[in-house]
């Protein structure tokens, strides 16, 4: 039995969780392939790590698989509470105990964030990769009293509309998308702008956003209150997989300091991944989840060495380039496969544009609290207007000197 390298078991357990979730979908299509896939993995583990470790990992595999089966085989009752997550015409999506259901016969007055009591007919229609367990044909419904989550969503919409009234839809969408993930109004031009600059990750709330917000809060308010407010921010931003991942890692880091334990970023990343997959197994197919974990893993594995190799550069530039490159090493292949194109300007974009995006993130989040104070609000709008103007000018400049068609 070879226990060497098993002092940090969480990465192995995380891999086993990933294996179990992929196996579940493959099993539904090809039993033989799924069986071969799983057996081969555990033979590999037994050969290199021994029977004892293989047995432990098999137990975790069974637990993860059982969790997945329970998740997808849940049958909603005839009357259920549903949290609305998407509305489009008379159709939409909602969450029932963490599972996603497709909804039909939705009234146009229902908004994202509403919690409704639904009476209807449920039909099983699984879409494993999207977390959908079936379709709900609404026969009758009642909008329940607005709760904390619903109030957060209403606040997001109100802040967006306030910014829109001053700067227009385009700039408002950019500010709210980079600040707290409200990107429903973000048009293709802005998405293309971020792609051209190689910084399209900023239009989704990620670890970058949360760490920035938490760092500012911690300096102003201390650790305990900052953790609470950071959690509210995660909920306010829609609780995306990257944001939740970052929050879990921040909590682990903070707790480790309290109990005076060394922080292991790889174990922390793995634990965050396990927790997220336990709650929502379909995250394994979520591109935001995948890119977030691969980017963080790349930083953990390569950032230190890249920093050393770039020692001749000034600290701020060296750190930015090292983080950008290390994050791209593992994510670039996925981006090319998933989006079928990639901008090679991510280094320039991260050095020149990201600092201004970070200012937008901070200002956008300040707006959440002061949007009703017209004098302060108008001043922030003035600053945001010129920041976006600078980003636009820089994008045009790059466009004129570099081929932005990407890698096809």
Segment roles from a protein language model:
Residues 73-90:
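Structural detector for short beta-strands of small beta-barrel domains
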Residues 97-112:
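Beta-strand/loop nucleic-acid-binding surfaces
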Residues 8-10, 26-32, 197-209, 236-249, ...:
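Membrane-interface micro-motifs in multi-pass membrane enzymes
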Residues 14-17, 242-408:
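Internal transmembrane alpha-helical bundles of multi-pass membrane proteins
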Residues 139-249, 254-255:
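Aromatic-rich juxtamembrane segments at the membrane interface
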Residues 96, 127-149:
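OB-fold/S1-family single-stranded nucleic acid-binding modules
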Residues 1-73, 396, 400:
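N-terminal leader/targeting segments
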Residues 112-134:
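Flexible glycine-rich surface loops and low-complexity tracts that mediate binding to linear polymers
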């Amino acid at each position: 039995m070879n226990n060497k390298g098993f002092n940090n078991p969480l990465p192995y357990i995380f891999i086993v969780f990933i294996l179990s979730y992929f196996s579940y979908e493959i099993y539904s299509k090809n039993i033989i392939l799924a069986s071969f896939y799983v057996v081969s993995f555990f033979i590999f583990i037994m050969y290199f790590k021994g029977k004892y470790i293989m047995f432990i990992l098999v137990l975790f595999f069974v637990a993860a698989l059982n969790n997945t089966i329970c998740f997808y085989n849940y049958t909603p009752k005839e009357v259920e509470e549903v949290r609305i997550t998407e509305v489009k015409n008379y159709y939409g999506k909602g969450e029932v105990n963490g599972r996603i259901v497709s909804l039909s016969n939705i009234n146009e007055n229902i908004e994202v964030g509403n919690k409704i009591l639904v009476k209807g007919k449920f039909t099983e229609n699984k879409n494993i990769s999207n977390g959908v367990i079936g379709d709900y044909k609404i026969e009758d419904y009642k909008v329940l009293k607005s709760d904390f989550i619903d109030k957060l969503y209403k606040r997001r919409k109100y802040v967006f509309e306030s910014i829109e009234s001053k700067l227009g839809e385009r700039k408002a969408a950019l500010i709210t998308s980079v600040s707290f993930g409200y990107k429903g109004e973000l048009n293709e031009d802005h998405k293309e702008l971020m792609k051209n600059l190689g910084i399209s990750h900023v239009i989704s709330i990620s670890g970058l956003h949360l760490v920035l917000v938490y760092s500012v809060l911690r300096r102003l308010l201390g650790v305990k209150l900052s953790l609470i407010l950071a959690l509210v921010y995660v909920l306010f931003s829609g609780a995306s997989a990257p944001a939740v991942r970052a929050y879990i890692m921040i909590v682990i880091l903070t707790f480790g300091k309290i109990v005076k334990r060394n922080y292991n970023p790889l174990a922390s990343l793995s634990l965050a991944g396990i927790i997220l997959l336990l709650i929502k197994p379909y995250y394994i197919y979520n591109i935001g989840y995948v890119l977030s974990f691969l980017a963080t893993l790349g930083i953990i594995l390569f950032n230190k060495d890249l920093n050393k190799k770039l020692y001749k550069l000034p600290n701020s530039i060296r750190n930015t380039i090292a983080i950008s490159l290390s994050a791209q090493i593992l994510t670039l292949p996925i981006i090319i496969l998933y989006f079928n194109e990639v901008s090679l300007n991510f280094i320039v974009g991260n050095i020149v544009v990201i600092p201004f995006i970070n200012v937008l993130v901070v200002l956008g989040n300040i707006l959440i609290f002061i949007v009703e104070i017209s004098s302060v609000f108008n001043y922030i709008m003035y600053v945001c207007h010129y920041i976006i103007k600078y980003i636009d000018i820089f994008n045009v400049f790059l466009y004129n000197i570099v081929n932005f068609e990407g890698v096809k």
